[in-house]
């Protein structure tokens, strides 16, 4: 069972590395990481490009619709995901190392 983790980002450069590393440290390894950047003006894209196995989606539109932008980011990322399960992670947050494994096992066993 493949897991997709969708990350919506806007100007969270200082948290991205911790966020991605929390996914790289997962005990469950069959996952894809999709990073949607909403036209950040900081160094977010340069930071995320250091992770070669992360799928990057760039929104280059000059819109400022607040939470609607985040919904659009999730919609676009879900459309491009290939996982059986989809997880959402904000770019200024991180997952416990067993989060994905625990949830995948729950779905497999129920």
Q: Where are these predicted regions, by residue range?
A:
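Acidic helix N-cap motif at the loop->helix transition within catalytic regions
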Residues: 15-17, 42-50, 94, 98
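Short, acidic, metal-binding catalytic loop of nucleotide-sugar glycosyltransferases
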Residues: 21-30
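A conserved acidic beta->alpha catalytic loop
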Residues: 37-46, 61, 90
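Conserved donor NDP-sugar-binding/catalytic core segment of glycosyltransferases
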Residues: 94, 98-110
């Amino acid at each position: 069972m493949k897991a997709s983790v969708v990350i919506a980002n806007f100007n969270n450069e200082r948290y991205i590395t911790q966020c991605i590393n929390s996914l790289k440290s997962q005990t469950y390894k069959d996952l894809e990481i999709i990073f949607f950047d909403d036209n950040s003006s900081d160094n977010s894209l340069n930071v995320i490009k250091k992770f070669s196995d992360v799928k990057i989606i760039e929104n280059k539109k000059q819109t400022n619709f607040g939470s609607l932008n985040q919904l659009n980011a999730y919609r676009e990322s879900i459309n491009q995901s290939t996982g059986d399960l989809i997880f959402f992670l904000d770019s200024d947050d991180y997952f416990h190392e067993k989060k994905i494994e625990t949830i995948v096992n729950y779905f497999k066993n129920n």
